Swiss-Prot record:
This is DegV domain-containing protein spr1415. InterPro entries: DegV, DegV_C, DegV_domain_contain. Residues 3-280 form the DegV domain. It comes from the Bacteria. May bind long-chain fatty acids, such as palmitate, and may play a role in lipid transport or fatty acid metabolism. NCBIfam families: DegV (TIGR00762). PROSITE patterns: DEGV. Hexadecanoate binds at residues 61, 94. Pfam families: DegV. Keywords: Lipid-binding. GO terms for molecular function: lipid binding. The lineage of its organism: Bacteria, Bacillati, Bacillota, Bacilli, Lactobacillales.
């Protein structure tokens, strides 16, 4: 089996994974005040947050290019590939997953699967890494898909948003709820539900209590089995490092890494947001 793995630029990937010759990353363009950027090419995460703060309206992200995906899939067979696996951002965030399902049977001699990851950012990047690890240890395509299905079903992220007004602009919270929330210092905790949609999990008074509750949730959800936990932030590295230390103090293992929300999720959540993602080690 020669396996090609696809993902998109919403995935937070390690430098080592990005060097994989069998990895193909589709760009997700982001439009800020009429200018188009691609994160990692002409826009860093830090620059994105700076530009978003100065923009007259929320940035808009597009879907990855189906034409580019088709072009690469068409070329794979002549390069000796037999299988292709695409791990793209959640169908609850983007319509891309639905848009490409027709392509699965369109390439003769190539076995293709596009499962719905129901997630994005760092957990998505770890899924990509996991697929390469399973392949390298000799797993066949069916076994990789089985392990991936288990991993997807037990992966999520819980998020604390700094700016409620940002959720209003993105249509995820009513203006009245945001005004009341700001008056009462309410910090909603959001999460990726089992359809991969970001929704409110619960509402907590004050950031301190919300942070404590985030840690409790992760402790509960990762109690059985081995998990990797990731602190993901929207241009708030000091807050993220502080939360990482809290996790270590609570005994949530030594494998707690840091990552940054890129433009796709950063547009929804705004600067200062912070999340705890978790994914099982399989």
């Amino acid at each position: 089996m020669k396996l090609a793995v696809f993902t998109d630029s919403s995935a937070y990937l390690s430098a080592e994974t990005l060097q994989r010759e069998d990895l193909f990353v589709l760009d997700i363009p982001v439009n800020i005040d009429g200018e188009e950027y691609v994160e990692g090419i002409n826009l860093s995460a830090e620059e994105f947050y700076q530009k978003m703060a100065q923009a007259s309206e929320l940035p808009k992200t597009s879907q990855p290019s189906i034409a580019k995906l088709d072009e690469i899939l068409t070329s794979l067979k002549e390069q000796g590939y037999t299988h292709a696996l695409g791990l793209f951002l959640s169908s609850g965030i983007s319509g891309f997953y639905q848009s490409i399902q027709y392509m699965v049977d369109d390439y003769e001699g190539l076995t293709i699967a596009f499962p719905d990851t129901l997630i994005t950012s760092a957990p998505l990047g770890i899924m990509v890494e996991s697929v390469f690890n399973w392949r390298d240890q000799g797993d066949d395509f069916a076994s990789i898909q089985d392990k991936l299905a288990i991993q997807i079903s037990r992966t999520s992220a819980f998020i604390m948003v700094d700016d409620l007004d940002h959720l209003v602009k993105g249509g995820r919270l009513s203006n009245g709820a945001a005004i009341l929330g700001n008056l009462l210092s309410i910090k909603p905790i959001l999460y990726f539900n089992d359809q991969g949609v970001i929704e409110v999990y619960e509402k907590v008074r004050t950031e301190k209590k919300a942070t404590k509750r985030l840690i409790e949730i992760i402790k509960e959800t990762t109690a059985s089995g081995q998990y990797r936990v990731i602190v993901i932030h929207g241009n708030a590295p000091e807050k993220a490092e502080e939360l990482r230390q809290h996790l270590l103090d609570f005994g949530l293992g030594s494998d707690v890494s840091l990552a940054t929300f890129g433009s796709v999720i950063g547009t929804h959540l705004g600067a200062g947001s912070i999340a705890l993602g978790y994914i099982p080690v399989i």
